[in-house]
Every structure is written in C-alpha cells, then in structure tokens.
Amino acid sequence: MPDSAQPLSERLDALEIRIAYQDETIETLNATITAQWQQIDALTRQIKAFHDRLQQAESNAPAAPANERPPHY
C-alpha cells in the first residue's frame, strides 16, 4: 500500500469503529427510551384508575360537613 493510502485507511478504520460504537449507543438509548415510555404509560393508566376511584368515592360520599350549617343555627 502506498504511504499516502495508509493514513487514509487508518482514518477510515477509525471512523468505522466510531460509527459502530455510535450505533451501539443509539440502540441502547432507544431501548432505554422504549422501556421508559412503557413505564410512563403504565403509570398514566394507574393514575387514571386512582382518579376514577377517587371520583367514584367522592360522588358516593355524603355532603362535606364544611358545607352544612351548624346545628345551632
């Protein structure tokens, strides 16, 4: 190989290695983000279920004593 091609070949190898590491990092980040979105979706469903249960409990509860007049009036 001519001397002028050697540095180019080394630079190309370095770039290929760098791209391989970047691809691995991107795949890892993608998997992490996917897992986080799944967890966010699960937590959102859980919060909605708690909210629905709270609304149902509030609608079935008697009127709050703060809204009623005291008996001595």
Swiss-Prot record:
Residues 54-73 are annotated as: Disordered. Gene3D superfamilies: 1.20.5.300. Residues 57-67 have a biased composition (Low complexity). Disulfide bonds: none annotated. PANTHER family: PROTEIN SLYX. Belongs to the SlyX family. This is Protein SlyX homolog. The gene is slyX.
